[in-house]
């Protein structure tokens, strides 16, 4: 059985978030009101609520890089990850860390991007 998650986070601009998650990322919108919207987030449920997002700081030490904390991510098959990266790049997404491979040639090698 595959375990699924539900994550609810704040976004400042719900219309902009609908465009990004629905249009750019290709997620299907589900239930919604004027203050929140649910998305099928690659098989998981992402619930975006209008409000002030968590503050982030670059305090996570990963492979000699300081990454934003807190953060969340997806583990995708590489072809699906690459297609998503291309969609995000084509849309002019402002990346914190552009798509790249981390831990190259090592156990746990991973493709990553932060935006």
Please provide the spans of the model-predicted regions.
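N-terminal beta-strand motif that seeds the catalytic metal site of vicinal oxygen chelate
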Residues: 1-15, 71-72, 76
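Short glycine-enriched loop/turn motifs at secondary-structure junctions
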Residues: 1-3, 65-69, 106-107
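Core segments of cupin and vicinal oxygen chelate
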Residues: 10-53
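Short, conserved charged micro-motifs
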Residues: 16-17, 79-84
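Helix-adjacent hinge/juxtasegments
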Residues: 55, 60-75, 79
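Vicinal oxygen chelate
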Residues: 85-115
